[in-house]
Amino acid sequence: MAATSLLYNQLKAAEPFFLLAGPNVIESEEHILRMAKHIKDISTKVGLPLVFKSSFDKANRTSSKSFRGPGMAEGLKILEKVKVAYDLPIVTDVHESSQCEAVGKVADIIQIPAFLCRQTDLLVAAAQTGKIINIKKGQFCAPSVMENSAEKIRLAGNPNVMVCERGTMFGYNDLIVDPRNFEWMREANCPVVADITHSLQQPAGKKLDGGGVASGGLRELIPCIARTAVAVGVDGIFMEVHDDPLSAPVDGPTQWPLRHLEELLEELIAIARVTKGKQRLQIDLTPYRD
């Protein structure tokens, strides 16, 4: 618990923001280790605290034919190797209460997927690991819902919680990001994270050659959403990064190219350093007098 509290306080105090980044899913041990090295080198160079992210199982896929990953047992072994080899904290997601104990032995941050952000039993099981809990806001939820989700973590005895904006459904096959949510989600009284890659998904918006659909996305707009988020003053940036996005087995259209990671982060840091987004403006409504 002491190590968890230390990491949580370090992330809360990070200036101008902290980074949760990595490939969407574990494709192989070799690929994950290589990506962890590159992303750590870049984050160290630009001066951002990094928590490395990847998933062991993509349980919520559009198609049953979609790649899911190596599974929990093998995936956690690989993430443990990343943790040891590069001295990096780890964030990964859970989908069932039964996974939380095992995941909590490896992950420093347990992530609750957006579609599961209201699942009380899952939130409580994750909280009881004592690890930091990152709750993604459901695409169907108002930002105020995250106050309740965060409170479920605290009532389970765990004060180490953060909430994450990842877009809102806008009709079929599309998401939008409402920048007001970055401000309103602060009412959860915890760090606010912006997922700048999943926010550009187009769910089930890509037709496959063999029939069926998969998630598409608008990768070219990732910088737009990222600039907005850091200007508003979010505490953390979540992003998925890949060295070959066109060949990525999952969410390729919304993974940011590794070759452009340093360039984007440098720009975001520059924006974050000049904005006063983390300082709430006190509005004086008394009558103006000369």
Curated annotation (Swiss-Prot):
Domain of life, source organism: Eukaryota
What Pfam families does the record point to? DAHP_synth_1
* GO cellular component terms, A-Z: cytoplasm
Kindly provide the name given to this protein in its UniProt entry: 2-dehydro-3-deoxyphosphooctonate aldolase 1
* Catalyzed reaction equations: D-arabinose 5-phosphate + phosphoenolpyruvate + H2O = 3-deoxy-alpha-D-manno-2-octulosonate-8-phosphate + phosphate
Indicate the secretion signal residues. none
Task: Kindly list the organism's lineage.
Answer: Eukaryota, Viridiplantae, Streptophyta, Embryophyta, Tracheophyta
Provide the GO biological process annotations: monosaccharide biosynthetic process; pollen tube development; pollen tube growth; rhamnogalacturonan II biosynthetic process
Write out the coiled-coil annotation as residue ranges: none
Gene that encodes it: KDSA1
Where are residues bearing N-acetylalanine located in the sequence?
A: 2
> Regarding temperature, what does the record state about activity?
Optimum temperature is 65 degrees Celsius.
Q: GO: which molecular function terms? A: 3-deoxy-8-phosphooctulonate synthase activity
InterPro entries of this UniProt entry?
Aldolase_TIM, DAHP1/KDSA, KDO8P_synthase
Keyword NAD tagged:
no
Give the enzyme class. Answer: transferase
According to its UniProt record, the EC number is 2.5.1.55
Query: What family is it from?
Result: Belongs to the KdsA family.
Locations listed in the record: Cytoplasm
| Free-text function comment from the UniProt entry | Catalyzes the stereospecific condensation of D-arabinose 5-phosphate and phosphoenolpyruvate to form 3-deoxy-D-manno-octulosonate 8-phosphate (KDO-8-phosphate) and inorganic phosphate. Involved in the biosynthesis of 3-deoxy-D-manno-octulosonate (KDO) which is an indispensable component of rhamnogalacturonan II (RG-II), a structurally complex pectic polysaccharide of the primary cell wall. RG-II is essential for the cell wall integrity of rapidly growing tissues and pollen tube growth and elongation.
pH dependence remark: Optimum pH is 6.5-9.5.
What does the tissue specificity note say?
Expressed in shoots.
Give UniProt keywords alphabetically.
Acetylation, Cell wall biogenesis/degradation, Cytoplasm, Transferase
* Gene3D superfamilies recorded: Aldolase class I
The family database entries (SUPFAM superfamilies) matched by this protein are listed as: Aldolase
